[in-house]
Amino acid sequence: MTSVFKSPSTYVQGRNVTTDIGTHAESLGDTALLVADEIVMDMIESDVHESLAEAGLDGSSVVFNGESSEDEIERIASVAVDEGADIVIGAGGGKALDTAKAVREEVGGAMVSMPTIASMDAPTSSLSVIYSEHGEFEDYWYYEQHPDLVIVDTEVVAAAPARFLRSGIADGLATWFEADAVAQSGGDNEVGGKPTRAGHKLAELCYETLREHGAGALDAVEHDAVTESVDAVIEANTLLSGLGFESGGLAAAHSVHNGLTQLAETHDATHGEKVNIGTITQLVLEGHSDARIEEFIEFSVELGLPVTLGEIGITNPEQVDLDVVAEAACDEAETIHDEPFDVTPAMVRDALLTADEMGRRVRDR
């Protein structure tokens, strides 16, 4: 049995660290390409390029169009080659960062991950989630290299809408349940080996941190405030969840998310919002007690996370083809098969409907 743990080379988190990116990146190369959508570009472009210039680095920018699709990756890779970039900086949300990772894989050089929201655990990982141009999950692309640098400006993250931090909490909560399932099944993690004890414990620490600080952090960011709880939750959503899911492993929750993306009705829900439905579904699949499942649903409701299919856009579950979701969740390449028992599409469909009913009952009582 071979256990594997991998991580980024450097992780930096703090107030206003955007202006320090040049200091941290100067040893990585000579010419940087900033990849971000228009909103993020307006927020950080001048600070990033000023810091790069102060460190003696050349820099240029390209606007990310919104989907981490194969076509978008090819387009931006072409820009990187034309600009002679040997550092790719991905800034923004998970899809921008995953696109930047894929571009680095194609053109070589170094990669800097610069999340402006703490809505997911993509910043630290060595994989990209690939979607169609219409937002449907297609594949995971795995890489040998992690980001060389992850830099998280807590001022920027706290100023983003609270929904993003809330979404990241949902993604982070799933990390523990999935890593624990993989540990029980003896399955593989996301970096090519069996989970390490460190990966498992980091996933558990992520869960404990979010339970302890989640509500307070959400209160703070409603006022764009950075507190100890905000710092703790940003680290949990980004670093602990990222290391925990890669080196601990994924199971049913993210497979259910991937299945849900097949329905256009869910495309306005964030990654984490769909994952939260996946977590409740996983708990049902695994046969946890009603009390355990209801306790998780109650905490989700306290944080404002979705606990029913209606809250992620599926207003009439009985009239929607949930078999499409279940079949996609059980694709042979999916991590749902790292659960400690065999899972079938019929089981997933029934668990989704049961999770939805339990969520509605607990939310409305």
From Swiss-Prot:
EC number: 1.1.1.-
Xref: InterPro entries: ADH_Fe/GldA (IPR001670), ADH_Fe_CS (IPR018211), Glycerol_DH (IPR016205)
Entry cofactors: Zn(2+)
Reaction equations catalysed: ethylene glycol + NAD(+) = glycolaldehyde + NADH + H(+)
Signal sequence extent: none
Modulation of this protein's activity: Is subject to substrate inhibition.
Binding note for cofactor: Binds 1 zinc ion per subunit.
Pfam family, one: Fe-ADH
Residues that hold NAD(+) according to the record: D37, G94, K95, T116, S119, S125, L127, Y131
Keyword Methyltransferase listed: no
Record: residues binding Zn(2+): D171, H254, H271
pH dependence text: Optimum pH is around 6.
Keyword Metal-binding: yes
Temperature and activity: Optimum temperature is 40 degrees Celsius.
UniProt-listed Gene3D superfamilies: 3.40.50.1970, Dehydroquinate synthase-like - alpha domain
Top-level EC class as recorded in UniProt: oxidoreductase
Described function: Oxidoreductase involved in the non-carboxylating pentose bisphosphate pathway, a nucleoside degradation pathway present in some halophilic archaea. Catalyzes the reduction of glycolaldehyde to ethylene glycol. Cannot catalyze the oxidation of glycerol 1-phosphate nor the reduction of dihydroxyacetone phosphate (DHAP).
NCBIfam families registered for this protein in UniProt: PRK09423.1
Family membership: Belongs to the iron-containing alcohol dehydrogenase family.
Matches recorded under PANTHER family: GLYCEROL DEHYDROGENASE, GLYCEROL DEHYDROGENASE 1
Protein name: Glycolaldehyde reductase
